[in-house]
Amino acid sequence: EMHPARITLVGGGNRLDHSITAIGALGHRGLMLIPRVDGWWNGEHLDVLHGPGELQLTLPPASTLSLVALHGPCAGVSISGTRWALDSVDLAPLVGWGVSNEVGPGGVVSIRISAGILTIFNASTPTPPTPPTEPPPPTESHS
């Protein structure tokens, strides 16, 4: 039996139905024991936090961060290190109360939930690194 430390979904495209389904799959109950569940979609980063759980992110100061309850209600949602802190609030599904927050000057954001599945979108996270390219072949030296 496998026990991964992380699952990362990488995808994109212009089909909204595919986007919603793929991102939604990260909230599957079978993934709740995996310590880190995240994804890259069209160059934007997201994390999925299964409750009860905590997540700390280091993000560029003043960048945008959104908390969205995509999979049902989330209870006891707290966030600090942002312009607008939340302290143990309940988020209803797909309600914009957690949308468009701003990372504080320190760049460290702490998120905690008591129950539910919370999706965290952080659009300003750098794109994933590209695989290294092959070095050019050595050139001959003529003396």
Predicted regions and their residues:
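Long, charged alpha-helical interface segments
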Residues: L49-H142
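Anionic-ligand-binding alpha/beta catalytic cores of soluble enzymes and soluble regulatory domains
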Residues: R6-Q56
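Short phosphate-binding loop-to-helix
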Residues: E1-M2
